[in-house]
Amino acid sequence: MESAKGKLGVMCVGLGAVTTTFMTGVLMARKGLAKPVGSMTQYDKIRVGRGKDKKYLHYGEIVPLTSLDDIVFGAWDVYPANAYESALNAEVLKDRDIEPVRDELKAIVPMKAAFDRNYAKRLDGDNVKDCKTRWDMVEALREDIRRFKAENNCDRIVVIWAASTEIYVPVDEEVHGTLAALEAAMKANDTEHVAPSMCYAYAALAEGAPFIMGAPNTTVDIPAMWEMAEKTKMPIAGKDFKTGQTLVKSGFAPIIGTRCLGLSGWFSTNILGNRDGLVLDEPANFHTKEVSKLSTLESILVPEEQPDLYTDYYHKVRINYYPPRNDNKEGWDNIDIFGWMGYPMQIKINFLCRDSILAAPLLLDLVLLSDLAARKGRYGTQRFLSFFLKSPMHDYTQGEVPINHLFQQYVMLKNAIREMGGYEADEEID
C-alpha cells in the first residue's frame, strides 16, 4: 500500500452549508478546539483477532489514513462567497465555532462552477464557467484540478460532490452504456443526457482522483463511468449521503424484518429550509431524491422472501421546503406494522436533526477511505462505503441487488478495513 504521507487535496463541488461545516470542523479539530464526533475514521474501533489475540483498534491503527493536518481544501461553487462568508450565511455553526479558523476559511475561495441552470433551476449564482459544450466543462475542470494540485503541493486529490441535487436523468443505454458513447455525447453537447455532475466525475477520474457522489444524481452509477474508473484505476463511490431519516430507516427496518413482523406501510416526510430544501422544492429535482430515498426498503423487507409479511406495503416519501427551519431538518416516520394473527400496530419516529452536522463526518470518512482505497490499488465501485450512502451503487446490469441493511453494511465496512490492514474478514458484529 502506498504511504498516507504528503498533502491530500480535498476538492468539494459546492461550498454551502454541508461543505463549510465539514471544513470548519476539520480546521477546528486540527487546533484541538472541536471534536470530530460522528466520524467513524476518528472514533470507531474494529476488533481484530480472536480469543487471547483479540484487540480493538481504531481504523488508523489498522490502515494508514491521511492525517487531518495534511488536508488541503478547495471548492467550486456557483456563488463567489469564500468559505468564511458561506459558513456565516449558512447559519449552521455559531460564530464562536467559526472565528478561530476565520483566516483559513477566508483563504478558500471557490473556483467557477461547471453549471447548467436547467439542472438546478432554483439556483441563480453567476460564478460559473463559460463553456460551449460538456466536453469544454470537462477540460476546464481538469485544468482546475491540475492547477489546484500544483499550487498547493498536493500529493493526491479526492473530489467529492456536496452540491445540490440535479434533476432526474434516467439511464440511457445508448449514451451511458459505454465510455466511448458518453465521451461522444459530451463532445456533441448532449445536455439532456450528460449532467454537469458527470463532467466533474469524468474530470476527477481523468486526473487520477477518486470521485464521491454525495447527492442522488445520476453520475457515477452508469456503466460508462464504471468503465472510466476501471480505465483510470480509480475508486468511485455513491450515492447520496445517508444522514437522517434514511439512516434511521436502514437501521430500523432490519428490526422489523429480524422479528418477522409484517409491514403495511411506511410514510416519511421532512421539513427542511436550507439551500438543499430550496432546490428540492422543484419537482424535477425532488424526483431524483425521491427515487433514492424510496430504494432503501426494497432490499431489506423483500416481498419475494416473505410474501405474507411484505407484499404490497405502501411506501411514500415527501420533503417540504420550510425556510424557518433552515438547516435544522425534522423528519417524521409513521410505520404501520402487524403482528400475531395480523393485528395492527404503529411506530412513530420524530427525528429533529441538524442536516449538515450529520453530513460533515460522512464527508470526512468518505474522503479518507476513498484515498485509502486508491493507495491500496482498489478501483471501481467501492461497495464497502455503502454504510455512508442512501442509495448504494451496484451493477444493476447484472441483476445485482444493493445492500441497504445498515448492519450488513457495517460488516462490509469493517471487513474491508480488516483486509486492507492484513487481517482476516469476520462476519460477527461486536
Language-model features and meaning:
Residues 211, 235-238:
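Histidine/cysteine- and/or acidic
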Residues 217-232, 271-282, 299-308, 326-339, ...:
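Short flexible/disordered coil segments
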Residues 237-239, 243-309:
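Conserved anion/nucleotide-ligand pocket segment
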Residues 243, 308-313, 423-430:
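Short, highly charged low-complexity linear segments
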